[in-house]
Amino acid sequence: MLKTKDTVLEIDNIVKEFPVGKNGKMTACNKVSLCFEKGKTLGIIGESGCGKSTLMKIVMQLEKPTSGQILYHGEDITKLKGEKLRQHRRNIQMVFQDPTTAFNPKMKVKDIICEPLLNFGLIKKGEKEEVAKKYLEMVELPAEFMDRYPHNMSGGQRQRIGIARALVLDPEVLI
């Protein structure tokens, strides 16, 4: 792992083990170390079940590592809790593999896209349509989609809604 002055996120010796049976364990990530640099794209490849998604869930703090650190600008985010963790989540966003399960099916597209902004108090409810339109255009979907529900869209269209939602907070790291 080569850390530079442009390193934004550092994954340092991450191990994730899941209990199996009475005394067993299954290792999903075994001493993984990576650096994410500002302005760079990093692809993580591997066969099904090798731990790619688990690693990204650890970065997002949706899973806790068994050991190791995730450093964001030098701060170990695996130790964050409560409001500090919530504020940190503005900086790192994720586009989930299956957008169908990532969205509340009772929410319209404009609400899905704008929910993060409302949660952080960055827009008022009256601004949702303007913001949703901007981000729908960004992901090349028509503005009239904002009043649709995700189950009325194709898988590719739902994926683009997930991308728009992840981009709306202008994160420093996008997974």
Predicted ranges, named:
Residues D76, E127-E144:
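Conserved ABC ATPase "signature" region
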Residues I45-E47:
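The feature captures the beta-strand-to-loop junction immediately N-terminal to the Walker
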Residues H151, L169:
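Conserved signature/switch motifs of ABC ATPase nucleotide-binding domains
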Residues G68-D76:
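Conserved ABC transporter NBD signature motif
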